[in-house]
A protein has these predicted regions:
Chain A
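Transmembrane alpha-helices and adjacent helix-loop boundaries
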Residues: 1-350
């Protein structure tokens, strides 16, 4: 890493750490920002880098949320009784119970969806292009419906999460730190991953899967790993989000296909898919626009969002980063040979 | 669940009720599905906003009925208005995403879906609305089986439209142009077909069909700005299962899906109806994929 | 592979810049406990989303009461007169958003007095937040019984809990059965409920009562939220012929049930459902809605009164006059107005803006409003106001149970719709 880029990384980290202290009233919103960053990054691994556009990554988010909830509650109480509509039991988690539950919950919330991703890969990854997209959307909807019908986890009534011990202010900061940590870890991991041959392989799958197979690439293995990586981080995000929100239920909180599920895609496209920083930029821009429209354009926020998606998709395909790359290629280390009497060598694209 | 199956065994007349309900529901799905299949087959655009076009048609019908026009009569002006709307959307949005990759078109129509839902919500409010057809119902088997006349009419209309579409595509010049473009756009262009007009026409016809479906739905059930997704999902399931070019298959699949939903609702419980639809989608996709894989393997 | 790391220096700058922009827009927190002469109450409520109709009913109720109280001189605390005002946010009918927005209302806007959201799900998400920050909330639109088993000290609910909505129907059925010489435990129940916290609580109330009288439940379906077709469920009811049919699925559920019951020729001697008024059953379906029993938190014929609105009938007249888009007053609106009255009363008794004093004042509430009697249990729910059953007779809602409040006798059994 160059010195300049290291400084910038540290600056961002510092801004991230300072934010909840500078604007304490917005801590929870900022935590959601980090979740968005994580959403965009994990989506890009599948969609941007590998060319498998998933509309159902939100499944892992919801799975993580529910697994964590069940673990947190189940360690101390009977889950079925806890979620029952009647005869609600008096609930009181000690600090130790809460933290162990949370830690174990987050851990399992990462592992569980990863395993599910591996299984789903085996089933769905034979589908190509739009069929894969529709198939994953179907999985997400099915997950929501089935969870709604399962009364052990509360069904449509949802689950009230255990309350965070510790005074007001502490809770927000704790989860903010956790979300930021998750997003940063995801970034570091993906950054490393994209510097290995793994990324070459998945890019090859994106560019031409049949040829890649013909060249001897075990595409199935790579596809499964890519999806599992996404699932791992999404599960963690789900667990944290569920605890932060305090009350979870299947259709809108855990498996919000039409909101978060699509936001993932929109953010990445906005920023420029297939790059490391594109999703992050996209997430930032998207998040900012969303918060602004929610506050100042109440009633019109979704229209603004819909229009943004349309404009982005129709007129601004390559996203912010792609657009910048085209305009100022030298910023990205791409050398465009403009000497008139030579055949223009476009340089390698990142 | 077994109790419910027993009912069907002990009193077979209820099978008829389920069949009739299912087929009338399926007929409406069929309408929505062939519009989708038409657009998908010709332009490769997968219109995620299909259900929202349907809702819009329903609301236009509602608005016209508030001015005293009977819903059945309103179908014609609604179809015309939706046709025009479809043309407009094609020009503004669809035209630019046709050449792009398939996922992009999915996302563009998704953005359109969100926008349309919200505009409908702002204009008409979030209440569910329903239209009175003023028709009665047929009672059969001593009142054991009831079917409203409007459902029978809807079924008839779907058949008529299906036949009309098939004839249009087979016999008319424009129909041939559409089929040519679907097969190979470049070749069609070389042969002088104005593919741009073909695409616009296809999309607008779809929009009109959705409009008609919307008015029917408002008469049989309810419309609400956010209910479009239920129809979009089912249309996708039907088209994916039946394949793109095969209109008779689309109808058969749609009717089948309608009946299957009724049975799953009866036997398993209404909460599993949506899950059944989605589960079916996944099954079909996976089955398709295994077939393709076997095909690929056999080629090797 | 190396290039894109270098070049993204600009990218990073963009990210930092955007983050700072968000911060700048966020601005500094405003302390809005009482600005000058205005007491600001806060509410995250369903302005959009699937409960937007009910959210509108509730917020119209809130606003109507605020306007009336302000017209009457506002609230006097220690000799100073304050007007009331409400700051709204849209929670899009989503619990997660409700919780987030309440954090914002309390932390950023500094508001210390909360009016509840619409719906049990959003209220369930809101209660832990207000509890954590020790901010009192008066809610009148979240009826789930499970809200009152957690020992919340800062939440006060003016309405009757959800399990009481349709339970009186079963009581009534038992009474009517015995009067006509039938054995109550021979009665069969067919029911369908939407799969959401409120409706499932209503269901539990019915299940508990059915168990008490030993009645058998023969159809028990859940309606998924996005479907507007229950014909499969109704076909089952046609086959099994229950004596009592109950539905709860918010406005959409009532509309769908009434229409499809007529279409499929389904009937029972007792038919009951929630949300009849918001579904506008009498205007939409006319004769097909006759005989349906509708629980309500409030009816304009009840004999409650207070100093702000007068009698229930006075409130009814005034609300309809001020809101021409309503043909009847939905109880969500009446509840909303009641909640604001409770706050005003608490301010008056506490003579303070301090949240702890107000919490204690709220806990000690013992008043009659046009909406009903208000007295809170230790858990926060209103134990002084029963649910009332009305029946649609001749296109009007008529109170039929509990018998001591009845204006007319109940029509039983319900006649089939032609």
């Amino acid at each position: 890493m160059t010195r300049r880029s290291l400084t910038l990384h540290l600056l961002i980290l510092a801004a991230g750490i300072a934010a909840p202290f500078l604007f304490p009233g917005h801590t929870v919103q900022f935590a959601v920002f980090w979740i968005f960053v994580l959403f965009a990054q994990t989506w890009d691994t599948m969609g941007g880098q590998m060319g498998y556009n998933s509309l159902g990554n939100i499944t892992f988010f919801g799975l993580g949320m529910y697994i964590c909830a069940v673990v947190q509650i189940g360690l101390v109480y009977n889950v079925g009784e806890y979620t029952a509509a009647t005869g609600a039991i008096k609930v009181d988690f000690t600090n130790q119970q809460y933290y162990t539950g949370l830690a174990l919950g987050v851990f399992l919330a990462a592992i569980g969806p990863t395993i599910v991703a591996a299984i789903l890969s085996w089933i769905l990854l034979g589908l190509r292009g739009p069929y894969f997209a529709i198939g994953t959307l179907g999985v997400a909807i099915a997950a929501a419906e089935l969870t709604s019908a399962w009364s052990w986890v509360g069904g449509g009534s949802g689950i009230s999460m255990p309350v965070f011990p510790g005074g007001p202010g502490m809770r927000e900061r704790f989860f903010y730190a956790a979300c930021m940590l998750a997003a940063v870890l995801c970034y570091l991991f993906l950054r490393w991953l994209y510097s290995t041959r793994f990324s070459l392989a998945i890019n090859a799958i994106r560019d031409d899967e049949d040829k890649a197979e013909a060249l001897g690439l075990h595409t199935v293995r790579y596809k499964t790993v890519a999806w599992s990586v996404s699932a791992f981080f999404l599960g963690i995000a789900g667990a944290l989000f569920g605890n932060m929100t305090g009350f979870i239920e299947p259709l809108e909180t855990a498996y919000p296909t039409l909101t978060f599920g699509i936001f993932m895609v929109a953010m990445t496209l906005l920023g420029g898919k297939g790059t490391l920083w594109g999703p992050i930029i996209g997430a930032t821009l998207f998040y900012t626009v969303r918060e602004l429209t929610w506050t100042y354009l109440l009633g019109w926020q979704y229209i603004a969002l819909g229009v943004l998606i349309i404009v982005n998709v129709v007129y601004f395909q390559q996203g912010v980063l792609g657009w910048l790359q085209a305009r100022k290629p030298h910023w990205f280390g791409i050398h465009v040979d403009t000497r008139p009497d030579r055949v223009a060598k476009a340089g390698s694209k990142p | 669940m077994w109790d419910n199956l027993q009912i069907l065994g002990n009193a077979p007349v209820f099978n008829i009720q389920l069949l009739l309900n299912g087929m009338s529901v399926g007929a409406v799905f069929a309408l929505v599905a062939y519009g989708l299949a038409l657009v998908w087959g010709v332009t490769s655009v997968k219109n995620l906003a299909q259900g929202d076009f349907v809702m819009m048609g329903g609301y236009l019908g509602y608005e016209l009925s508030r001015h005293g026009i009977h819903p059945m009569v309103a179908i014609v002006p609604v179809a015309i208005l939706m046709f025009a709307y479809g043309w407009l959307i094609y020009r503004l949005i669809i035209r630019r995403v046709i050449q792009l990759d398939l996922f992009t078109s999915l996302l563009a129509t998704f953005g359109l879906a969100i926008t349309m839902q919200q505009v409908l919500n702002l204009v008409f409010g979030p209440d569910v609305r329903t239209l009175k057809s003023g028709f009665g119902r047929f009672e059969m088997f001593g009142g054991m089986v009831d079917i409203t006349q409007i459902r029978v009419i809807a079924f008839g209309m779907c058949l008529v439209l299906a036949v009309a579409m098939v004839l249009f595509l087979k016999k008319s010049r424009m129909g041939q142009a559409i089929r040519a473009t679907a097969q190979d756009p470049r070749a069609a262009r070389v042969l002088g077909v104005n593919t741009d007009i073909v695409y616009a026409l296809t999309f607008s016809i779809n929009s009109a069909i959705c409009g008609v479906a919307g008015v029917i739905i408002a008469m049989i059930w309810v419309i609400q700005p956010f209910y479009g997704i239920a129809y979009s999902v089912r249309a996708f399931v039907i088209v994916t299962a039946a394949g793109l070019g095969n209109f008779p298959a689309v109808i058969a699949t749609a009717l089948g899906l309608g009946v299957l939903e009724q049975y799953s609702g009866f036997v398993l419980g209404a909460q599993f109806q949506q899950a059944t639809v989605v589960g079916l989608l996944l099954l079909i996709l996976v089955w398709r994929q295994t077939l393709l894989r076997r095909h690929r393997l056999s080629l090797q | 592979m190396q290039q894109h790391f270098q070049g993204s220096a600009l990218a990073r700058a963009l990210v930092v810049g955007a983050a700072l922009a968000v911060g700048a827009v966020a601005g500094t927190p405003v302390s809005a406990q009482a600005e000058g002469d205005t007491i600001v109450l806060g509410s995250a409520i369903s302005i959009t989303g699937k409960y937007s109709q009910e959210g509108k009913n509730a917020s119209d109720g809130y606003n109507f009461a605020v306007k009336r109280i302000n017209e009457m001189g506002g609230v006097k605390i220690k000799g100073k007169t304050y007007k009331l005002a409400i700051k709204y946010y849209d929670d899009e009918s989503t619990p997660a958003r409700t919780a987030q927005l309440l954090e914002r209302i309390i932390n950023q806007d500094g508001i210390k007095y909360i009016l509840g959201p619409y719906g049990s799900g959003p209220t369930k998400a809101a209660a832990p937040v207000t509890e954590k920050y020790k901010i009192p909330m008066v809610e009148s639109e979240g009826a789930s019984r499970s809200l009152f088993t957690q020992g919340y000290r800062y939440m006060f609910a003016a309405l009757s809990t959800s399990d009481q909505y349709l339970a009186p129907v079963i009581d009534l059925a038992d009474e009517l059965a015995r009067k006509s010489g039938k054995n109550p435990s021979d009665m069969k129940i067919g029911m369908a409920f939407e799969n959401d916290p409120f409706s499932l609580d209503v269901r539990q109330g019915v299940v508990d009562q059915a168990k008490k009288f030993n009645m058998k439940i023969v159809v028990d379906d859940k309606m998924p939220r996005d479907l507007s077709d229950i014909s499969a469920t109704l076909t089952k009811m046609k086959a099994l012929r229950p004596d009592i049919i109950v539905f709860s699925g918010h406005t959409k559920g009532a509309t769908t049930a009434t229409r499809q019951m007529k279409e499929l020729g389904v009937n029972a001697s007792i038919v009951a459902m929630t949300h009849c008024e918001s579904a506008k059953l009498t205007t939409q379906f006319g004769a097909a809605s006759e005989g349906i029993l509708c629980p309500t938190q409030w009816a304009e014929t009840l004999k409650y009164k207070d100093d702000v609105f007068g009698t229930a009938m006075d409130y009814n007249k005034a609300f309809l006059a001020a809101h021409p888009d309503y043909k009847i007053v939905p109880y969500q609106a009446a509840q909303g107005s009641g909640a604001v009255e409770i706050w005003a009363d608490a301010f008056r008794r506490a003579q303070s803006l301090d949240t702890e004093k107000l919490r204690d004042a709220l806990a000690a509430t013992d008043m009659q409003t046009f909406y009903g009697n208000i007295k809170f249990s230790a858990e926060g729910n209103n134990i002084a106001k029963p649910m009332v059953l009305r029946q649609i007779q001749g296109g009007k809602y008529v109170v039929v149970a509990p018998t001591k409040y009845a204006s007319e006798p109940v029509v039983y059994p319900r006649k089939a719709v032609q």
